[in-house]
Amino acid sequence: HSEGTFTSDYSKYMDNRRAKDFVQWLMSTKRNGHAEGTYTSDVDSLSDYFKAKRFVDSLKSY
């Protein structure tokens, strides 16, 4: 039982650490002056992907 708790706590820690590292990366690249357009493009691409995925999933449900 304690091993599972440790694993869960460690996973949460690593998720938080990765999120903090990602935010730091975004902040540092934005300071360099070229992240905004790249970030917007990536978000748009991701948004389009999820819209398409939802559409395909809705077709599969019929």
Swiss-Prot record:
* Induction pattern: Produced in the A cells of the islets of Langerhans in response to a drop in blood sugar concentration.
Q: Does the keyword Secreted apply?
A: yes
| GO molecular function terms listed in the Swiss-Prot or TrEMBL record | hormone activity
Write down the superkingdom of origin. Eukaryota
Annotated keywords: Hormone, Secreted
Q: Which GO terms describe its cellular component?
A: extracellular region
Q: Where in the cell is it found?
A: Secreted
**Pfam families membership:** Hormone_2 (PF00123)
Quote the function comment for this protein.
Promotes hydrolysis of glycogen and lipids, and raises the blood sugar level.
| Family listed | Belongs to the glucagon family.
Q: What is this protein called?
A: Glucagon
Native organism is Scyliorhinus canicula (Small-spotted catshark)
